[in-house]
């Protein structure tokens, strides 16, 4: 019996998209300091940058709200091993809050739920900022990604539900007034991991007796990294391949605040095999007990180790150094 004849209608349709050759991705190691625009999620920004750089492996170092702009460090290849260190790092922001109005979300996207007269002056604002410097307790906002019973808080909020949240200790390392054009107040804050600048603005507004919400947020620093060497997606898109690669910083840009240890050839080989190195066999290491250090041979980053119990113990190794 002959097999049935196929017709043009039976054949799978081909399109320009299906015929387009796939662009090969490449292994790329380094850090891209991206100046994220307002309106784009951190994940979408990562996807665009990864596509422009034709990179195989990439990740970001903690989300920046779509309504916020500014510094978003992106890690490629071996740099992804050290992204956790930036998650733990202090952050610096410039923010503008509007006094006299509270919103459902704590920012300009939410519905105004409370309006009060603004009866304070610049001196009162400056005094309030001083009160919020140092260790403070924050109650996380309902419109946040924190989870309760496996569900983000913002899902409860969108359903009109309020979930009880416990206050958390955070540290405001610096809080400076940049402009006071009431009812708008612009400030710069350097804060510990887990600080909600929206909540900080709301709490300052309550301390001033008029409430407040955030109208602008721009991140200018993550640990030792700053916007000074950041690139926008538009600039990255307009650049040629060589110029795009030039924006990549080396992996150890993430580790610049770690004490430095340099090993001889023999010790470097042992380190790359995951062996602990007795401190007695090494040059003195300027690091406290239990402190993490960045480890190099004569020219290359080998990884990160911890100085503890008389040894230098490898924790993260750079594969490309092996």
Curated annotation (Swiss-Prot):
Where's the active site on this chain?
Answer: 65
Asked if the Swiss-Prot or TrEMBL record annotates the protein with the keyword Isomerase, the reply is yes
GO molecular function annotations of the record: RNA binding; tRNA pseudouridine(55) synthase activity
Q: Which residues form the signal peptide?
A: none
Q: What is its EC number?
A: 5.4.99.25
A Pfam entry, by short name: TruB_C_2
State the residue spans of region: Disordered: 1-22
A single Gene Ontology biological process assigned to it is: mRNA pseudouridine synthesis
Query: What is catalysed by this protein?
Result: uridine(55) in tRNA = pseudouridine(55) in tRNA
Source taxon at top rank: Bacteria
Q: Which family does it belong to?
A: Belongs to the pseudouridine synthase TruB family. Type 1 subfamily.
Database matches in PANTHER family: PSEUDOURIDYLATE SYNTHASE TRUB1, TRNA-PSEUDOURIDINE SYNTHASE
Function recorded in the entry: Responsible for synthesis of pseudouridine from uracil-55 in the psi GC loop of transfer RNAs.
What name has this protein been given in UniProt? tRNA pseudouridine synthase B
């Amino acid at each position: 019996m002959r097999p049935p004849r196929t017709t043009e209608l039976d054949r799978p349709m081909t399109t320009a998209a299906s015929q387009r050759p796939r662009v090969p991705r490449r292994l790329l190691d380094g850090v891209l300091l991206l100046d994220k625009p307002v309106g784009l999620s951190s994940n979408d920004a990562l996807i665009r940058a990864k596509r422009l750089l034709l990179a195989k492996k990439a990740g970001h170092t903690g989300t920046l709200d779509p309504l916020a702009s500014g510094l978003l460090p992106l890690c490629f290849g071996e740099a992804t091993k050290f992204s956790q260190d930036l998650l733990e790092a202090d952050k610096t922001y410039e923010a503008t809050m509007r006094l006299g109005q509270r919103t459902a979300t704590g920012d300009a996207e939410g519905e105004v739920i409370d309006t009060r007269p603004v009866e304070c002056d610049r001196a009162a604002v400056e005094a309030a900022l001083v009160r919020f410097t140092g260790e403070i307790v924050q109650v996380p906002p309902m419109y946040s990604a924190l989870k309760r019973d496996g569900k983000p808080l913002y899902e409860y909020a969108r359903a009109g539900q309020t979930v009880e949240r416990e206050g958390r200790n955070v540290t405001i390392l610096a809080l400076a007034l940049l402009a006071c054009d009431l009812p708008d107040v612009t400030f710069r804050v350097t804060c510990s991991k887990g600080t909600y600048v929206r909540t900080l603005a709301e709490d300052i507004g309550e301390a001033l007796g008029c409430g407040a919400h955030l109208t602008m947020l721009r991140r200018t620093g993550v640990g030792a990294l700053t916007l000074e060497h950041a690139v926008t997606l538009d600039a990255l898109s307009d650049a040629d391949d060589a110029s795009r690669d030039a924006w990549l910083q080396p992996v150890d840009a993430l580790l610049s605040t770690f004490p430095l240890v340099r090993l001889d050839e023999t010790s470097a080989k042992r380190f790359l095999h995951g062996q602990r190195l007795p401190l007695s066999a090494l040059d003195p290491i300027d690091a406290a007990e239990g402190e993490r250090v960045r480890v190099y041979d004569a020219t290359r980053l080998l990884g990160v180790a911890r100085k503890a119990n008389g040894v230098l113990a490898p924790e993260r190794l750079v594969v490309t150094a092996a």
